[in-house]
């Protein structure tokens, strides 16, 4: 988390996020240069690319105004770390085959399932989580949610050992009837 402070002071954390949410409002070419220089120096540390260019971009592109206000300023300041939860033990990255379910219960959804090989999993505060809301619809049954990791029922598994990129954690994540409001849906259902 301390590295997020360093990158924020240098203007390199979520720099494509609009200024209205605390970002610099720059284009992706700036990020390409930043990440190219990180790679050139051999820095494989925390998953800044996932945090900045995947999670923040999902929220920026598909989030409601309330979701943007809730998460983007914290992500820019390094106060909230983002992660992308899609890969599952039996499905890999084949989203139409995922088993993590989100079942509607009144104004909420109840999420149960498991993810694996999730970068930033040990540190994340918010997860863009792929779930199945309709198991009969194949890929069209996949719905994304923003899951706050402080919610009851969320649990981090072990930090997985890897051959490389040891500075970036890769984790198992478990969701045991995690209740999220329908307003946590990112984009539309399916």
Regions found by a protein language model. Name each.
Residues 2-6:
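Short, small-residue-biased leader/transition segments that mark boundaries at the very start
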Residues 9-79, 119-126, 137-138:
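Internal helix-loop-helix
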Residues 11, 34-39, 131, 147-152, ...:
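Short Ser/Thr-interspersed hydrophobic loop/turn segments at strand-loop and sheet-helix junctions
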Residues 30, 149-160, 168-190:
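A glycine-rich, basic-preceded beta-loop-alpha segment at the flavin cofactor/substrate interface
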Residues 48, 75, 90-93, 117-120, ...:
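Short Gly/Pro-enriched turn/cap motifs at secondary-structure boundaries
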Residues 78-86:
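A short, Trp-centered hydrophobic/proline-enriched beta-strand micro-motif
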Residues 112-156:
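A short core secondary-structure module
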């Amino acid at each position: 988390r301390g590295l997020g402070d360093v990158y924020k002071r240098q203007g390199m954390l979520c720099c494509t996020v609009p200024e209205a949410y605390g970002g610099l409002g720059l284009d992706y070419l700036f990020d390409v240069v930043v990440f190219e220089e990180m790679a050139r120096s051999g820095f494989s540390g925390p998953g800044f690319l996932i945090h900045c260019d995947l999670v923040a971009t999902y929220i920026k592109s598909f989030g409601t105004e309330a979701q943007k206000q809730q998460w983007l300023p914290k992500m820019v300041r390094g106060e909230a770390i983002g992660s992308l939860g899609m890969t599952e033990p039996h499905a890999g990255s084949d989203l139409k085959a995922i088993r993590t379910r989100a079942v509607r219960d009144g104004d909420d959804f109840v999420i149960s399932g498991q993810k694996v090989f999730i970068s930033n999993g040990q540190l994340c505060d918010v997860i863009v989580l792929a779930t199945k809301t309709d198991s009969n619809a194949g890929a069209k049954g996949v719905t994304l949610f923003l899951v706050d990791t402080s919610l009851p029922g969320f649990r981090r598994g072990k930090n997985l050992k890897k051959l490389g990129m040891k500075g970036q954690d890769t984790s198992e994540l478990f969701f045991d009837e995690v209740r999220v409001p329908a307003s946590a849906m990112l984009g539309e259902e399916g």
